[in-house]
């Protein structure tokens, strides 16, 4: 992240104010303030992650993934023989915090800030699947989009989607 000295000064002052406004996170803000003031390039890359951008298309895909899991769970709930499919297979796991942090952040934003998909269980890891999921979800979406009744799935269709 390239910043002018003036931009660094402004951001440093913002972190100083945040230290006073949010004492619970004061250490974090002091650390970031030091990084900005001293211009530590390696650590400034952390700010790139914090201030990164998630394109509209990616956001829509993540919402589509969450819609798919909503449809999977509702369809599974309506099955007469639910035992043929493990409930965990139709429960949204989230994304990997190590490799898909931006996607994970968006999921948490949608649930915790926007109030959507509040029925999803964040589990003990807060939607951190702890394994990369993007490719798997893409395969699942392709199968789901091919289903004629996306919100009234049969057991066979559910199995095809979760096994994609």
UniProtKB/Swiss-Prot annotation:
Pfam family name, one: YfbU
Signal peptide coordinates: none
Gene3D superfamilies hit by this protein: Helix hairpin bin, yfbu gene product, domain 2
Domain of life, source organism: Bacteria
Transmembrane segments: none
InterPro entries: UPF0304_YfbU, YfbU_alpha-helical_sf, YfbU_helix-hairpin_sf
Entry similarity comment: Belongs to the UPF0304 family.
UniProt name for this protein: UPF0304 protein YfbU
Native source organism of the sequence: Shigella flexneri
